[in-house]
Amino acid sequence: MDSHHGYPFMTPEERELNLLYDEAINVTGGFDVPKFPDEFVMEGQIVPVVFAHSEYMREIGSRYCKLAIETYNKQHNTNFQFTELIKWNAAALLNYITFKAIDQNSFGRPMKTFQAEIYDHPGKDELDQVEVEFCRLAPPDL
């Protein structure tokens, strides 16, 4: 029996999308992945978080970005300030966020794009539940 990469229940189109998804995960680390059809969900799948029309979700995303850039600033002795949430993908409690920030010490310099991986621990009190796994400058092609 041909397992079709472990998913015999997928249609040929879904298998093709799954291969593209796997490749995107390998290339981007979860920061840029194709969207599966809504009726098809895999355990652990990284999916886009819809934040554009939700003030609550924008606030959470902004909080994640501010914590991430604070971590970056401490690690690199810089003074970036979060300005804009660009993209947010998530798989359960793990968040892959792309955002822009500006260097407060460099007048007139363009904003830079960052990527952060954020883990939101369940059950901890509000101040301690979010952990910045890493924050880095995004690859130049973004």
Predicted regions and their residues:
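Short, non-transmembrane alpha-helical segments in secretory-pathway proteins
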Residues: V50-F80
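Compact beta-sheet-dominated globular domain cores
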Residues: M1-Y56, I86-L142
